């Protein structure tokens, strides 16, 4: 389960991939498959969530790792070179590392 909390000590990444509409689902499927087969088994991986922009031109990945060092180790793994090359070939990726500042839930969802 994804835990989004300003009290968490997780390393959070938001990846925004700008794509041509014909590549949106293709990229999302690729990201999901690589995550299922390899990334989720790596040390420090917590979660990944993929979102398709209604405009057909964006895939957004919200990912969490136990630490930035765990994320960097994944990124340096040579088994993922083809994955990153594919992503760059079908999209313009933008990676943003974040700290969770605030979260809110609806009153009907257990929030105040």
Region spans (language model):
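Short acidic-aromatic low-complexity motifs
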Residues: 3, 21-22, 41-42
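Short, surface-exposed ligand-recognition loops at beta-strand->loop->(often short) alpha-helix junctions
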Residues: 18-31
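Glycine-rich beta-strand-turn "strand-cap" elements at beta-sheet edges
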Residues: 1-10, 49-57, 83-112
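Residue-level signal for secondary-structure boundary sites
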Residues: 23-25, 69-71, 106
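Short, well-ordered beta-strand segments in beta-rich or mixed alpha/beta enzyme
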Residues: 11-18, 47-77
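Short, flexible segments with low predicted structural confidence
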Residues: 10-11, 27, 42-43
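An amphipathic, aromatic/His-enriched active-site/gating alpha helix that lines ligand/cofactor pockets
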Residues: 33-46, 64-97
């Amino acid at each position: 389960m994804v835990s989004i909390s300003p009290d968490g000590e997780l390393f959070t990444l938001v990846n925004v991939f700008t794509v041509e509409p014909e590549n949106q689902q293709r990229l999302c499927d690729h990201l999901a498959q690589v995550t299922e087969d390899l990334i989720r088994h790596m040390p420090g991986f917590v979660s990944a969530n993929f979102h398709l922009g209604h405009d057909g031109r964006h895939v957004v990945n919200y990912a969490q790792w136990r630490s930035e060092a765990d994320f960097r180790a994944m990124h340096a793994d040579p088994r993922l070179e083809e994955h990153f090359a594919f992503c760059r070939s079908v999209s313009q990726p933008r990676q943003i590392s974040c700290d969770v500042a605030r979260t809110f839930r609806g009153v009907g969802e257990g929030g105040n």
